[in-house]
Amino acid sequence: VNTDGEVNGSSDTYVAWNWLGANGTASNSNGSITATVSANTTSGCSIVKWSGSGSNATIGHGLGVAPSVVITKSIGGSSAWGVYHISLGNTKILFLNETGAVGTNVAYWNNTSPTSSVFTVGSDAAVNHSGNDMIAYCFTEITNYSKFGFYVGDALNKGGPFVYTGFRPAWIMIKRTDGADTWTMYDNKRIGYNVDNNPLFANATTTESTDDDLDILSNGFKIKRNSGRINTDGANMVYMAFAENPFVTSTDNGSIPATAR
């Protein structure tokens, strides 16, 4: 990093969350637009670059399994970060840099779910900006490493939702879908113990909050706070959760336990 205050300001404390792609890139012509792809099938993530067309198109992702989450951004444009999430389906989108509720439009994903080889984009600039290079970060579930889903908030009326992931999460992001609220992120490094897991917000530049929202457990996470952004009564909350490392292979059948805490 250089000396810029966004990444290395004097006396400031920073956090970085990193996902490993492949050691290099490869051309991928599985879709209607040829893309440049760095794919790591072990961890279930790929980075995809293509030239936006502004019209319906398919893009190869290199994972060999349909991604559960696709995050898109126009590199040269000011359009929003588009988020496809499997729990929302192929007609809806969220925007990572905004607080708004889920949006519905055929122009986002052309009402088409990702396949084992491609994801589909429509004409909206957030997903396929005409004349601009686009980037996408694709994630598929890996047993005992990553989980993408939703839960329903209870405002602590039932003690707070427990979300089973099958592993101890190292990083969690949550977004309410039916109303305006923040993208809330937690990790096991900044504080690193329950009940003091402080949130940061993907859509904001503010410092971390001191709210104690959840406990990170050996097999998932437990919501501990009556907060609109993560526990509105009756509201759907989508989440992404990752463990420290993808320890299992497809033949392990989930047999390796997470470390208890």
Give the role of each language-model region.
Residues 1-261:
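Surface-exposed molecular-recognition determinants
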